[in-house]
């Protein structure tokens, strides 16, 4: 059942992104990009809070992070819990507690886990978010795909070479490393394979 839900969720995300394919009118691309917002007040304030509460109780904090930050990488979730509990490092016990809470949240149907990312099951909306210290490994394929799609809606077409730079700038990267470009291109390849975009003579366009 969980796998069916994940597929439905992924398909809904894809459909939602491409329902938005309508021409932007007077809206500028930069107006569609939002500042990355971190979850605060997640209900855990100390080490005792984390380790004395049941997985179901800690799951409420995971839900809050997912609601504010989803899609969010698990390592970011661990960091939020660590910081909220004023712990110096994310040791094995903390990771075990967080992973147990993630499982409880998944079982309750509040969070959907796809790969290393957590999604709020109540929302199919994926925003393009600008980060202060972006790391491409911590950005989901869905958010990268949404970024590519919105660029192509606004610009109509773009050279394959310049696309990674445009995408990375929207995420807050000041320069585009090879690793970042490779990840963006891998998502572009998936979009081409899915018939969502086409690549012709090095020019990328929406299908």
Residue ranges and their predicted role:
Residues 7-207:
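C-terminal non-catalytic scaffold/interaction domains in large multidomain proteins
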Residues 1-2:
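A conserved SF2-helicase RecA2
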């Amino acid at each position: 059942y969980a796998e069916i839900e994940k597929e439905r969720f992924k398909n809904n995300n894809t459909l939602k992104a491409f329902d938005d394919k309508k021409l932007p009118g007077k809206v500028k691309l930069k107006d569609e990009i939002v500042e990355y917002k971190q979850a605060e007040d997640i209900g855990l304030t100390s080490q005792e809070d984390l380790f004395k509460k049941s997985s179901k109780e800690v799951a409420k904090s995971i839900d809050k992070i997912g609601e504010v930050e989803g899609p969010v990488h698990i390592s970011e979730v661990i960091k939020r819990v660590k910081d909220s509990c004023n712990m110096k490092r994310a040791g094995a016990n903390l990771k075990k507690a967080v992973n147990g809470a993630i499982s409880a949240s998944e079982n309750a149907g509040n969070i959907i886990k796809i790969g290393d990312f957590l999604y709020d099951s109540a929302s199919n909306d994926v925003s393009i978010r600008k980060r202060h210290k972006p790391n491409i490994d911590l950005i989901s394929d869905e958010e990268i795909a949404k970024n590519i799609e919105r660029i192509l809606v606004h610009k109509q077409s773009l050279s394959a070479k310049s696309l990674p730079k445009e995408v990375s700038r929207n995420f807050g990267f000041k320069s585009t490393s090879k690793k970042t470009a490779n990840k963006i291109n891998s998502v572009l390849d998936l979009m081409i394979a899915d018939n969502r975009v086409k690549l012709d003579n090095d020019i990328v366009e929406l299908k």
